[in-house]
Amino acid sequence: MTQSPFTLEANGLVLAVRLTPRASRTGLDGVRTEASGRPVLSLRVAAPPVEGAANAALTAFVAKSLGLRKAEVTLLSGETSRTKRLHLSGDPQMLAARVEAWLGG
């Protein structure tokens, strides 16, 4: 069984992300496994990693892709790192279903 890049919490879901900034276009590259064995969602954004532009583009892209408001997607950790943790606010089961559908499974 494949591990998931997210964990459910009482008030939402935490999504592990590996971000590539300054890409040719913003998009989803699927799930990958880091060297530590932890699964992460591989995403790319066109914005550069300057003054939070890539993080803002990341949260906006995730919110739009999952049908959430921007305020429902917050950066928990990884502000200056490529590996990030995002908190998605809402019903955990509904959010998990949306993430699974986004991933194509």
UniProtKB/Swiss-Prot annotation:
One Pfam family hit: DUF167
Xref: Gene3D superfamilies: YggU-like
SUPFAM superfamilies: YggU-like
Cellular component terms (Gene Ontology): cytoplasm
InterPro entries reported for this sequence: DUF167, YggU-like_sf
Family membership: Belongs to the UPF0235 family.
Protein name: UPF0235 protein Mchl_2407
Organism in which the protein naturally occurs: Methylorubrum extorquens (strain CM4 / NCIMB 13688)
Lineage of source species: Bacteria, Pseudomonadati, Pseudomonadota, Alphaproteobacteria, Hyphomicrobiales
